[in-house]
Amino acid sequence: MMKKMKPRICLACSAGGHLRELQLAVGTIPQDYDCYWLTLRTTSTMAFMKDKEHVFLTNFQPAKKWTLIVNCIQAIFWVLVKHPNVIITTGAGVTVPTVFFAKKLLGTKVIFINSAADVTRPSRTPVWIEKYADLFLVQWEDMLKVFPKATCCGVL
């Protein structure tokens, strides 16, 4: 009898508050499923990732166009190497290429959790990711006016 494979879950976020919100959102999921983290290399993320499967991406900066190219190449590479079935992300911009290429190349399911900092207006990342998300969550009811197809999950 064949052993059923657990879904491969990519937990993708920027450092700082986005990482903290994703930690709150996923709780114990990483212990129960085949998960890996995808984020930026900072002192705090390196400490948190010490005992976790992870990938560090280059942060893209609008003023330095080459960083977007590097981030896209890294995103394609890691999507093809890791083959995530699901991406759970809180953004920010560094995760957009990974979501885009995973969706287009593999048909990966995407769960996006909008930042609690977005109370009445969105930042750029949710606007970009909304069209690729299979489940789009907002933390404030006022954000349902901006994203009417979203689900309000409450503040994490």
Predicted features along the sequence, with ranges:
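An aromatic- and histidine-rich active-site surface loop
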Residues: V86-L105
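Short amphipathic alpha-helix
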Residues: C10-L11, H18-I29, T42
